[in-house]
């Protein structure tokens, strides 16, 4: 009985310690048309969804905001913050933002312009899923991981350049990007998940700058698409790709243009 009480007290103390260590966010406040959660101790702010209605047209997120005579630094865009905002056209994100949480721009079907700052390290799960008006996306060099379904069903996306620091492209990352014709993978690419580029029927060229063929599987690309898609890799790595599935199934495997290889090695 004593052991039971002792263990129960320890468990309660542990829970209390965890709760006390969590950021103390206040209720959402609205400042100049944008809703935020404010963290009292660190003076950080997170953009969150509107309580009523949707964000529309152009949104410019500031680096800092003022509330009750206190300055807060905007460091995050919260889970689902702009989800389903079908009239949102463009978003400017400041360099103070280090975290864009999952589903942040989920099915923002009119979103055609968004600049991801160099402070962001990961594009989270389904962040831009269903943003069908996006034609291009500039992924900054700071990003190392592209999460599951991050750009899934971005049906207007024409091309994508994955920067050199990205090591992992997760499952379904670009699934259903039906207009996608060109993909450039950086030299740090290590692993590409299942169906990452599936249902991309217009994919014609894949430029992969990794010296060794990244880990992938038979479902990473469409089987039919790979038969009509050209793969371009470093000259010294052509045989490595030809001997590695699923890369060996591509219609042709050729050396990257010299100037393209030099650019990626910089």
Q: Which residue ranges define each predicted feature?
A:
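Short, T/G/N/S-enriched strand-turn elements that build extracellular solenoid repeat scaffolds
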Residues: 194-195, 216-223, 242
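Acidic, glycine/polar-enriched metal-coordinating patches/loops
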Residues: 220-224, 237, 244-251
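Bacterial N-terminal signal peptides that target proteins for export
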Residues: 1-13
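Boundary at the C-terminal end of the N-terminal hydrophobic targeting segment
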Residues: 24-30
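C-terminal cell-surface addressing/anchoring modules of secreted/extracellular proteins
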Residues: 260-266
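Bacterial N-terminal signal peptides
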Residues: 11-21
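Structural signature of tandem-repeat unit edges
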Residues: 33-35, 40, 54-76, 86-99, ...
């Amino acid at each position: 009985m004593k052991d039971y009480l002792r263990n129960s007290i320890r468990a309660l103390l542990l829970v209390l310690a965890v709760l006390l260590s969590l950021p103390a966010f206040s209720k959402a406040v609205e400042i100049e048309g944008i809703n935020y959660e404010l963290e009292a101790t660190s003076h950080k702010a997170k953009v969150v969804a509107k309580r009523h209605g949707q964000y529309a047209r152009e949104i410019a997120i500031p680096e800092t905001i003022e509330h009750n005579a206190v300055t807060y630094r905007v460091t995050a865009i919260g889970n689902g913050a702009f989800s389903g905002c079908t009239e949102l056209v463009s978003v400017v994100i400041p360099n103070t933002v280090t975290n864009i949480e999952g589903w942040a721009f989920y099915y923002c079907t009119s979103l055609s312009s968004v600049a991801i700052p160099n402070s962001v390290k990961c594009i989270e799960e389904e962040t831009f899923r269903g943003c069908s008006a996006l034609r291009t996306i500039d992924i900054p060099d700071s990003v190392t991981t592209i999460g599951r379904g991050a750009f899934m069903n971005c049906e207007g996306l024409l091309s994508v350049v994955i920067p050199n620091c990205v090591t992992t492209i997760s499952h379904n990352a670009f699934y259903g990007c039906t207009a996608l014709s060109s993909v450039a993978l950086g030299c740090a690419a290590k692993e590409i998940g299942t169906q990452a580029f599936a249902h991309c029927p217009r994919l014609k060229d894949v430029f992969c700058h990794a010296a060794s063929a990244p880990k992938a599987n038979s479902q990473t690309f469409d089987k039919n698409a790979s038969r009509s898609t050209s793969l371009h890799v470093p000259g010294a790595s052509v045989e490595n790709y030809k001997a590695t599935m699923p890369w060996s199934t591509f219609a042709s495997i050729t050396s990257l243009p010299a100037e393209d290889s030099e650019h990626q090695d910089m």
